[in-house]
Amino acid sequence: MGRKIIYSILFFIITILIIILLIYGYFKIIGLESRVPEKKENLYSIRTEKYLDRKVFIVTPNEGKTSDEVILYLHGGAYVGEIEMEHWEFIGQLITDIGATVILPDYPLAPKYRYTDTFKMVEPLYKEIVDKVGAEKLTVMGDSAGGGMSLALVEKISTETNYKIPSKTILISPWLDVRLTNSEIEKVEKYDKQLNKETLKLAGLAYAGEDGINNYLVNPIDGDISKLK
């Protein structure tokens, strides 16, 4: 009971600190649902569907190159930030270049939700996509925190389920260790104009929740990659 009380107090403090950081601009948007950009409809079509009480954006090309490839894209944002315009720009470029369908889940965000809540959405979504199109046509892709989540998802699929892993897993500057234990971080942090080690630690703790910070789904650097390709 004592440990649970300590955890509850700790995560209450973390939540307050993240809100303060939000006010001072460290995180643009926190825990809010993502919105569809208004000026992109001429480039691609966006269909919004409800999935387990969350939104999933299904993005397809309006013209030009098309393919039967599907990309499950998990956006970055330190596990607390919503889908940004930069993500939409990148997805638009993907669609233009390869003509794939991009499935973009608006997954649950910390500090309101934990990694367990997030995986309750993204894992069944992955399985549903595989059931519909096959793993051989699926790419799992993500940037930053979404890159870490992408690797963790594929590790989980490969070790804890009978589902096939995707044909490709593409990680863009993935956040693989929310504990930030790499000693090289100290050397490069002063050159980083956007990210701050201490605020990232708070975000990582909020995402990890009471299960602690050492689960491979939070730190996919600790996961089993032997079956990945």
Residue ranges and their predicted role:
Residues 1-18:
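N-terminal Sec-pathway targeting helices
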Residues 28-32:
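Short Lys/Arg-enriched alpha/beta "domain-start" segment
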